[in-house]
Amino acid sequence: GASQMGASVVLIERGQMGGECLNTGCVPSKALLTAAARGDSYSAAYEHVQRTIAEIAPQDSRQRFEGLGVRVIAASARFTGARTVSAGDFEIRARRYVVATGSTPVIPPLAGIDDVALLTNETLFTARPEPSHLLVLGGGPVGVEMTQAFRRLGARVSLVEELDLLP
């Protein structure tokens, strides 16, 4: 990367190293799909997801990035000027920034939603005990993948999408 070519690089992360992809996105979702396609039980699929995250985590660790010459700051960040970012007790000045903020699940304002055990992409992969019936809101790629995976794992799944499914 840039640090290996002599650039000064700072990585600011307020959450877990590896961000959304490693912890609550691509890695656990693909591990779950793989386990479900193999016909694993929910328990075995759960363990496969956790093991897969643990195997990849060292590649996204603070130690690895620091070993590559990247300064890692565990904090929230905000721009305080055109070329200045404040992160925790640090102030960083740079000519260029890459902003990769990740995402936050949106909980729709539905009547009764506060009365159910709600799962999001941030909690789905650690769901215990095994869900027997899921209602998936959203028929995009993630919603369809999770519908398929949990159905293969034996759960009843209902998928709801507000847009037309096919033209």
Which residues fall in each region the model found?
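Glycine-rich NAD(P) Rossmann-fold beta1-alpha1 loop
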Residues: 15, 140-141
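Rossmann-like dinucleotide-binding cores of NAD(P)H-dependent redox enzymes
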Residues: 51-58, 62, 125-126, 131-135, ...
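Glycine-rich active-site loop/strand segments that organize a redox cofactor
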Residues: 29-52
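Short amphipathic alpha-helical segments, especially helix-boundary/capping motifs
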Residues: 5-8, 38-41, 120-122, 152-158
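Generic secondary-structure boundary signal with a strong preference for alpha-helix termini
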Residues: 30-31, 37, 81, 114, ...
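The feature marks cytosolic C-terminal regulatory regions of anion transporters and related permeases
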Residues: 13-14, 162
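FAD-binding core/adjacent interface of flavoenzyme oxidoreductases
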Residues: 1, 5, 10, 17-27, ...
